[in-house]
Amino acid sequence: MNHYLLLLFVIFLTCAGQLSQKQATHSWKENAKRQTLIWLGLSVIFLAGGMLLWLKLLQYLPLSQAYPFLSINLILVTLSGHFFFKEKVTLQHWLGIGIMMVGILLLGQGI
């Protein structure tokens, strides 16, 4: 499997796990135990899948090259929080995201 594709799967699964945890907190506030358990279960599945694929990825890429790309999760989770959960994202957040994207592009030159 292509290393980039594997890395994208890791990023997607990790992000999905974080979003599932956030959704579980909404269900928890509403005292919807069944929904909370479903979201927590999905979170565990996504995060465990991401971890297993991460271990596979580390067989092919050095940690020093692969790990910085997990910063994409910070960007995706921030954007998802803003669009799906209506969380406020300040100008400082947007500037930070821009800086991270530049850093990821610079680091990506080595892969």
UniProtKB/Swiss-Prot annotation:
TM annotation in the entry: 37-57, 65-85, 91-111
Q: In which pathway does it act?
A: Bacterial outer membrane biogenesis; lipopolysaccharide biosynthesis
Q: What is its main location?
A: membrane
What is its membrane topology? Multi-pass membrane protein
Q: Say if the entry is tagged with keyword Transmembrane.
A: yes
Is-annotated flag, keyword Transmembrane helix?
yes
Record text on subunit structure and interactions: Heterodimer of ArnE and ArnF.
The name on file for this protein is: Probable 4-amino-4-deoxy-L-arabinose-phosphoundecaprenol flippase subunit ArnE
